[in-house]
Regions:
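Intrinsically disordered, low-complexity acidic/Ser/Thr/Pro-rich linker and tail segments
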Residues: 1-43, 121
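Per-blade loop-tip surfaces of WD-repeat and WD-like beta-propellers in eukaryotic adaptors/scaffolds
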Residues: 2-4, 39-48, 82-92, 117-139, ...
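Core solenoid repeat modules with strong leucine/isoleucine-rich periodicity
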Residues: 107, 116, 124, 144, ...
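N-terminal cofactor/phosphate-binding cores enriched in small/glycine residues
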Residues: 32-49, 55-60, 78
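WD40/WD-repeat beta-propeller blade N-cap
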Residues: 11-15, 52-58, 94-100, 142-149, ...
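Conserved strand-to-loop turn within each blade of WD40 beta-propeller repeats
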Residues: 33, 74-77, 115-118, 164-168, ...
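Loop/turn segments within WD40 beta-propeller blades
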Residues: 20-26, 62-68, 103-109, 146, ...
């Protein structure tokens, strides 16, 4: 007698840590459950857990805006896997060698920005259509902070991105060199800056610190 059992879901395990991510129009939710990733369909009221696992509990989840089936999950030590959720396929392994505090795909999905201690690394994302020998290729490393980087926020065009750090500052970087542009620092906080945001027209930048202070700059 032959049987064809396959992994479908995790029962009895609860959320421990890591960020949750909405995908598409908000009808899908990705949530870390230990060292696995669960997917919730909020419209059909169903869920399943992917049959892939990281070495340690998941600390960060990133979803590509250009293809919401493309998801990166990184564990506490910086070991990451890239998954195609719709096909339930494991695309690549990556060791970032340091804990990943934030990871964000660019708006077009072609780049992945990852915190790396006091630096930010931007990687070219692999194609989901072809199998590549080196799926992740380092584009550039960005420096300027003096302590761990905590968050990354891309501009709508993907030409610039914001970072925040424990050094109580935020910085604006360009993805590629722009004539006449130098990375700009946003200071004035008295505690770690946990997040930064672009205004609607991206003329103003807001930084928020752990002590609930919000500052704006242009």
């Amino acid at each position: 007698m032959k049987s064809s059992f396959r992994f479908a879901n995790v029962c009895g395990t609860v959320y421990q840590q890591g960020n949750i991510q909405f995908a598409g129009d908000g009808d899908m939710l990705y949530s870390p459950v230990g060292n696995r990733l669960s997917v919730f369909d909020l419209v059909r009221n169903t869920s399943f857990t992917l049959p892939f696992e990281t070495r340690k509990p998941i600390a960060r989840v990133a979803v590509s805006p250009a293809n919401t089936s493309l998801v990166l999950v990184a564990d506490e030590d910086g070991h990451a896997i890239l998954i195609n959720v719709s096909r339930r396929a494991l695309l690549a392994h990556m060791n970032f060698k340091l804990p990943v505090r934030d990871a964000q795909f660019s708006p077009n999905g072609q780049y992945l920005a990852v915190t790396h201690g006091a630096q930010v690394q931007v990687w070219r994302t692999p194609s989901v259509l072809v199998r590549e020998f080196a799926p992740f290729v380092l584009h550039r490393t960005y420096v300027g902070h003096f302590d761990d980087v905590l968050s990354i926020t891309w501009s709508r065009t993907g030409r610039f991105f914001l970072t925040t750090s424990k050094d109580m500052s935020g910085r604006l970087f360009s993805l590629d060199p722009v004539p006449g542009f130098r990375p700009k620092t946003f200071s004035g906080h008295r505690d770690s800056v946990v997040r930064a945001f672009f205004s609607l027209v991206e003329y103003t930048i807001y930084t928020v610190s752990r002590d609930a202070a919000c500052l704006g700059g242009q």
